Amino acid sequence: MKPIKRILIIRFRQIGDSILAIALCSTLKKSFPDAEIHFVLNKNIAPLYEGHPDIDKVITFDKNENKPFTAYIKKVWQVMHKNRYDVIIDMRSTIRTLFFSLFSLRTPFRIGRIKGYTHFLLNYRTDTYSKNLTTDMVQRNLLLAAPLEKIRPIQYTKEFKLYLTDR
């Protein structure tokens, strides 16, 4: 298998959930130190992640790029064709976020959550919402990295740190 060079993590919406996603970014950076980590977020929360040492690129969507739906699809298509990803981790796994995987079907690892409609586009689906799970949200997010253990052992970390910049 070829080396992992570029990883896309999709985590739109809430500020709290996106902060908890930093542990996944840090885990992936530790496990694949030569890979670029790209993080997709809503524009209004992106400044919290710019300059983070475990995130190489922040990709933002603003209100105008989310609606109308055609503008959203166009932006997703542009992102996916500008960057060739080896791994896509769709932390929300909604019908809207699955377009990232649709426009990148050759990506070897398209990882997300088990939902009734995700088996069409994700080749690795993780049960992070099972009623049997008693783990916290950070641990549930880290479960999304488990399929990458096929490549190498994953160095999990539950730390999530924010870094302040001068801006």
For each feature predicted by the language model, list its residue ranges.
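Catalytic machinery of carbohydrate-active enzymes
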Residues: 1-167
